[in-house]
Amino acid sequence: TEKIGKVFSHTQMKPILGFKAMFLCFTDGVSQFLLDFSLHGEEGKRSDKPQGLFKKQTEARYCKEHSGDERIARRSAEYFASKIETAISMLKRSIIEGVRFDYLLVDSWFTCSELLKFVVSRHFGCHLIGMIKMGKTKYETDLGNKTAPELIKALQKSKNVKYSRSIGYYTATVSAKISSIKVCLFFYRRGKNGNWNALLTSDLKLDAKEAFRLYSRRWVIEVAHKEMKQNLKLGKNQCRDFAGQIAGISL
């Protein structure tokens, strides 16, 4: 298949042959509509194995000239583009077409200052709610410039952790800044011995319970993926050319 290469599967936890698809979904909590998508490949870490393929595999891969079709050229340009930049382009196209939303819900891969800046600068008053990694990113807070793990330790030490019966999680909240933008960080843990996870939002009016409730709507895109795979054979397209793969997903 044209452009196909090795991509890392987070379900199988190993590189597999295929594409990565990114979808933009709109939901009201009941119905969901897929607004846009893009296909991506991974260039690979080794120069002698582009996309994780040996030279013979690369040479044997199907290739086709597309006679300057602008639509295919745009899709091809997306293939190795930054997923953050592509996501912002998707949002721009949707907004131009009249789509309005209250919250953009994203996983930890997309929660970053670039996307945050884009969302809070929109004129119709939308906000970002995203999972954050319990990693090395530092946030400006009244507790100092600390990482998420350092913040939850400080909150535990100061006894600012509460149990929420309604959602069944221990929670903690802290106001912060990232790239000079005010945000709230909400920490959640299931049980006394569970791992801490955290959400970031630009909506300073939310509390931990409401942020949790809103973010849980992101599950609908996982349901949509499952239904597309089961009922519409997503990922089973046998077309060899890239345009055919794009058309198959569009249909």
Write out the residue ranges for each language-model feature.
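A short alpha/beta connector and helix-capping loop motif
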Residues: 2-18, 113-133, 236
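A short secondary-structure junction signal
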Residues: 36, 115-118, 140-142, 197-198, ...
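Short, conserved catalytic/metal-binding motifs centered on acidic residues
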Residues: 1, 24, 104-109, 128, ...
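Basic, amphipathic alpha-helical segments enriched in Lys/Arg and hydrophobic/aromatic residues
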Residues: 234-251
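Short amphipathic alpha-helical "interface-anchor" segments enriched in bulky aromatics
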Residues: 208-239
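Active-site-proximal, Lys/Arg-enriched surface segment
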Residues: 1-55, 168
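Charge-patterned, long linear interaction tracts outside catalytic cores
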Residues: 184-206, 219
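An internal, acidic/charged active-site-proximal segment
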Residues: 52-53, 57-192
